[in-house]
Amino acid sequence: MAEKQELSKEQRILRAAEQVFSRKGYTDATLDEIIKIADTGKGTVYKYYGNKDFLFYTLIHGKNEAFLDKLKVSCDAKLPFMDRLHGFLLEMLKFIIKNKMLWRVLIVQAIAAPSGWCFVWNDKKHDLDIDVQWGSKPTPEEVAIKKKYTMILRSEIAVLVDILQEGIDSGIVKPIIDLPLVAANIFFGSIVMISQTRRADINLNEDVDIMVDRIMNGHKK
């Protein structure tokens, strides 16, 4: 209880939200359970966040911003290509290990399309198009909710795209036809790998070295 009281109301709510969303996913999470764990009033939660979606977004956005700040240091454009690649993969694995369940929930919110539609990136517009594969067109509210989560994931993948593009431009990496797709596969594949591993003796530097080897040997001239 003492630790709870040392935190601000917002911090207690976000910490409780992380516990509940990580354990139950988005759909089954309830504000009532979050309120109980945070040891605060319902009115306080609604005052700061309004609804479950905005609370989840605030939690995810905060973690995303902190992650991107770390990547700015470890993947600084002034660093050599291999250092940037290694730095990205190391920070990514550390981040996923810490937030693996929460980021799986994020992916479901951003990508899962039970209503039969998804986003497709449009290079000319530099924006997302809606691809309705079956069923009816989504409402503007549905598009807005899913888009903000999709853009969070894209912001993280974009860092790897930039690094690999540098490798291509400098002649270290051969041209890649669909660079964003390759970067996304590396990113999402890492989340799946971390989510499914039961190893207690993970050596991040060794794992990163293996990933760098696979990436470079797959695309090296």
Regions found by a protein language model. Name each.
Residues M1-K24, D28-T40, F54:
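Basic, helix-initiating cap at the start of DNA-binding domains
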Residues D39-Y49:
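Short hydrophobic/aromatic patch on the recognition helix
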Residues Y57-K63, K70:
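Alpha-helical DNA-contacting segments of helix-turn-helix folds
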Residues T58, V73-M101, A183-I186:
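Hydrophobic alpha-helical connector segments
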Residues L90-I97, I107-S115, D131-S136, R214-H219:
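Helix-loop "lid/cap" segments that line or gate small-molecule binding pockets
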Residues K94, A158-V173, V182-K221:
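C-terminal peripheral helix-coil segments that are non-catalytic and often amphipathic
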Residues R104-L106, V173-I176:
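Short, hydrophobic secondary-structure boundary micro-motifs
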Residues G116-S170, P180-L181:
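Amphipathic alpha-helical packing segments from all-alpha helical-bundle domains
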